[in-house]
Amino acid sequence: IKNKKIFKIDHGIYSDKEIVDPMILFSKKYENSIITMDTAFYFYNLTDIIPDKVYLATNRNSNTIKRENIIQVWVPKEKLNVGKEKIKVNGNTINIYNKERLLVELIRKRNQIPFDYYKEIINNYRKIVDTLDSYKIEQYIALYKNENTLGNIILREVY
């Protein structure tokens, strides 16, 4: 702010930087949303593929976000905040799912994801398996009806 320059980034959002990371921008704009899937996998270095859109989890009763660079993932209210963490990025706080919740989401959506991309992320999870909290994974799996199947796939694919 030395030069007294403030840039309007979006409606109601201003910054001292002309270019703002879309992940940070949309975390500010949609405060109740949570960074998920491809955006979160990239953030955690589980893939080197830079997502061209920001993936945001929102309450399934939320309004549709009408932006072409956002993929909105609707989640039931009772599951939305499970695994949510607040992380500081460049001085800004973002909501993002932890690695354990993302692993469960990855397994749940494995048939909707390109196989090579899925395998890359799974291989990177294998490298960090010792840092994962197994208890959290079990809790997140228990949220879904097919918990035995999900648990078996995670054991087979990652552990």
Positions of PLM-derived features:
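A short, conserved structural fragment
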Residues: 2-10
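Nucleic-acid-binding surface
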Residues: 9-159
